Regions:
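Short runs within selected transmembrane alpha-helices of multi-pass transporters and secretion channels
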Residues: 81, 150-168, 176-184, 209-224, ...
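Residue-level signal for short hydrophobic patches within transmembrane helices
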Residues: 20, 24-43, 47, 69-76, ...
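Small-residue-rich hydrophobic transmembrane alpha-helices
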Residues: 60-120, 157-176, 274, 287-345, ...
Length: 464
């Protein structure tokens, strides 16, 4: 019933729409739902943090220390999801329905297998990980309590994101947004009930926030499967005659790798920033955790728009339509630039209000307001670099796409942070973000221009 309720009804077949609909209108249709979905996806941790901060600053620090682990889990989910999305969109562009269905089955198997593995790994690394970042026994115990429950979110998280990307590849962008909304609503409603023990619910503290998160992901997975198994889906699970194809698994990993790197590097980056900040105070770690959730909400919401452009570019690359490929890139870049300017202005003008969401102490506000304004400047260049990386990904230029993300979120950032922190102390840490994004944009533009000179379209040749 859920599948019938949210099924997008169109008079035009999706493949025809991707090939002939006006590019500007098509990007809006394809991008708004994943934009909202990414906003909702990254609101989970922000919602948890906002409620948990009302327990204590130590509780906020605990959730902040857990953020790199949960971000790495989300990155793995997006890795499989985007790899499957790119392949399915390409196959549909080439009118290879059977290959698209086989890709669906492989994607689901990978989601469950890798999800179970990450569940186990997160449970194994918790103690040494949290022990490395705090000597405060209360923060350590709160971190363990939160992450011991959140570890079990990975299978439902990977499964529902994989299905979300499969359905988006067919042009149906509304249905995935619906089951995403359902999960966030559950998390938002049950967070205060389980954290503070409202009504008949027990007061579980920080553990209650984790239970609400897992419940939200579980509901999203159930609704996603109900949709995928509906009769009117353009891709289906192929069981008859199915056998694992190693080359296809490798293709999924390869095509989704740039998106994984973009998301996973943020996890490693937060870990390294925490190593710098631990020399200053637990409050500095709590602040950066709060700020980074705001940043991720802005950046990853824009990334949702970018991911809406990806299947359009990929489809027309598969169909050999150079003009529509480039038109989608130009229009998408203009939209991303506008949204990043809006995000920059929001953080620069309202830093105190944003910190207020996390019940910030006077100590945190004393340096946090100026730090947020400094780091917000980086948004102006971040969107352009990410859009260039996505274009390279859509046209199967995987290594240059990955290189841009490596430079932006790790190699250049850590290098600038190390040097500027030596010169300017904690202010140098904040300044390293806009400096890195500016340098990455210049390098990404050079990589993009070099790639355009050698770019070739597949013109209907097979995608494998």
């Amino acid at each position: 019933m859920f599948g019938q309720f949210v099924e997008k009804r169109e008079s035009m077949q999706t493949n025809n729409k991707m090939a002939v609909a006006p590019v500007g209108k098509l990007i809006w249709q394809m991008s708004i739902p994943p934009l909202i979905s990414m906003f909702l996806q990254y609101s989970y941790n922000l919602i948890d943090s906002a409620f948990v901060a009302r327990l204590s600053e130590n509780a906020l620090t605990a959730v902040s220390l857990s953020f790199p682990i949960t971000t790495l889990m989300n990155a793995a989910s997006i890795w499989i999801g985007v790899g499957v999305n790119v392949l399915i969109a390409g196959y549909l562009g080439e009118r290879k329905q059977d290959e698209a269905n086989i890709t669906v089955t492989h994607g689901l198997l990978l989601a469950f297998g890798i999800g179970a593995l990450l569940n186990l790994l997160s449970l194994l690394i918790m103690k040494p990980y949290f022990g490395a970042f705090t000597n405060n026994e209360e923060i350590y115990q709160l971190s363990m309590a939160y992450m011991s429950v959140c570890s079990f979110m990975q299978i439902p998280n990977m499964a529902h994101i994989a299905i979300q990307k499969m359905i988006q590849a067919t042009g149906n962008m509304v249905a995935p947004m619906c089951f995403q909304i359902a999960g966030v609503v559950v998390n938002f409603v049950f967070d205060p009930l389980l954290i503070f023990g409202i009504g008949v619910f027990p007061a579980m503290g920080i553990r209650g926030a984790a239970v609400a998160t897992v419940a939200g992901y579980l509901l999203s997975m159930i609704l996603a499967f109900a949709l995928l198994l509906g009769k009117k889906q353009k891709v289906r699970i192929k069981i008859k005659g199915f056998h694992l194809q190693k080359w296809l698994i490798g293709r999924i990993f390869t095509l989704g790798l740039p998106s994984f790197i973009m998301n996973a590097l943020s996890s490693f980056m937060v870990t390294f920033v925490n190593f710098f900040l631990v020399a200053y105070s637990d409050t500095a770690i709590a602040f950066f955790g709060a700020y980074f959730k705001v940043q991720q909400l802005i950046v990853m919401t824009v990334n949702g728009l970018i991911q809406g452009c990806l299947p359009i570019m990929r489809f027309n690359y598969g169909a050999g339509n150079r003009d529509r490929l480039h038109s989608a890139f130009r229009y998408g870049t203009a939209l991303v630039s506008g949204m990043m300017i809006l995000g920059t202005l929001t953080v620069i003008l309202f830093p105190a209000q944003l910190l207020g969401l996390f019940t910030a102490s006077e100590s945190m506000r004393s340096f946090g307001i100026s730090a947020m304004r400094i780091m917000a400047v980086s948004y102006l260049f971040c969107g352009w670099s990410t859009m260039i990386s996505t274009y390279l990904q859509a046209t199967e230029q995987v290594f240059p796409s990955m290189l841009i993300q490596l430079l932006r979120q790790f190699l250049l950032l850590i290098s600038f942070m190390w040097g500027l922190e030596k010169l300017l102390k904690i202010t140098g840490i904040w300044l390293s973000f806009p400096v890195t994004e500016t340098a990455t944009f210049v390098l990404a533009l050079l990589i993009f221009r070099a790639g355009r000179k050698t770019e070739t379209l597949c013109s209907g040749t097979k995608t494998q």
